[in-house]
Amino acid sequence: MKHLVVNIGDIQAANDLPFVLFGGMNVLESRDLAMRICEHYVTVTEKLGIPYVFKASFDKANRSSIHSYRGPGLDEGMKIFSELKAQFGVKVITDVHEAGQAQSVADVVDVIQLPAFLARQTDLVEAMARTGAVINVKKPQFISPGQVGNIVDKFREAGNHQVILCDRGSNFGYDNLVVDMLGFNVMKQVSGGCPVIFDVTHALQTRDPFGAASGGRRAQVSELARAGMAVGIAGLFIEAHPDPANAKCDGPSALPIAKLEPFLRQMKAIDELVKSFPELDTGH
């Protein structure tokens, strides 16, 4: 199978290279908390030798409730990201929700993310593509893995070939998600070998059909992440928090940050083992 390499500065992401970590917090809750969380991730990933990109949202524009916390907004968010980059020398990924935000965000961060709910919005895709930034495409829960090829084609037609794909599960009936482990290879194939990242945090989400906030299955994060890493992928997407019960968004799915190092040790061991095996051509 062909493996494309996407360069995030000096970090190389590919399905046959050591895995890259996209990790941080769901949404920027405060400057100080972002600094604490980023410092912890940087310390652990440097210790373990894992290439790392800090993740947070400056605006959660798709919250279920009008009363839910959204974030500090574009201007303050970019200030915080700039400070994190200066303080820790870290790469940053964040999501873009409107075409008019794309260039302003790409001027600051290293990877811009296309949200799952917006992944078929052509105007947004084209605006993001024109920035020339590395793109992380969240596969929508409501499309099959094979359909991501159409999204990748839009970016390429707009002149951007630096595309990473990210799976966060698929709808399984109402208010539930499952992860199709066979889908990772389908995404690789239909994209011509794009790096595939597994967003284990959001794959753990559950919904109360009458509630305003997401639930989660944090207790199953290790099992699900181990299964995904065993397929052989380019990276893992994991959010952590020092106090998940009081996180302002998706706390029930967040990894307690004190568990980050032992968690990543397991992921690194699986990744190294799987990628030490030769690829077997078993036909089509």
Curated annotation (Swiss-Prot):
InterPro entries membership: Aldolase_TIM (IPR013785), DAHP1/KDSA (IPR006218), KDO8P_synthase (IPR006269)
An example Gene Ontology molecular-function term:
3-deoxy-8-phosphooctulonate synthase activity
What top-level branch of life does the organism fall under?
Answer: Bacteria
State the reactions this protein catalyses. D-arabinose 5-phosphate + phosphoenolpyruvate + H2O = 3-deoxy-alpha-D-manno-2-octulosonate-8-phosphate + phosphate
The question of whether Disulfide bond is a record keyword is answered with no
* SUPFAM superfamilies assigned: Aldolase (SSF51569)
Pathway annotation: Carbohydrate biosynthesis; 3-deoxy-D-manno-octulosonate biosynthesis; 3-deoxy-D-manno-octulosonate from D-ribulose 5-phosphate: step 2/3; Bacterial outer membrane biogenesis; lipopolysaccharide biosynthesis
Where, subcellularly, is it found?
A: Cytoplasm
| Leading EC class | transferase
Would you tell me the Gene Ontology cellular component terms?
cytoplasm
Residue runs in coiled coils: none
- Alphabetic keyword roster: Cytoplasm, Lipopolysaccharide biosynthesis, Transferase
User: Is the Transit peptide keyword given for this protein?
Assistant: no
The Gene Ontology biological process terms listed for this entry are:
keto-3-deoxy-D-manno-octulosonic acid biosynthetic process
EC number from the UniProt entry = 2.5.1.55
**Primary place of residence?**
cytoplasm
Q: Record's PANTHER family?
A: PHOSPHO-2-DEHYDRO-3-DEOXYHEPTONATE ALDOLASE
NCBIfam families, alphabetically?
Answer: KDO8P_synth, PRK05198.1, PRK12457.1
Q: Which family does it belong to?
A: Belongs to the KdsA family.
Output this protein's name. 2-dehydro-3-deoxyphosphooctonate aldolase
Organism equals: Sodalis glossinidius (strain morsitans)
Q: What lineage, starting at the top, does this entry show?
A: Bacteria, Pseudomonadati, Pseudomonadota, Gammaproteobacteria, Enterobacterales
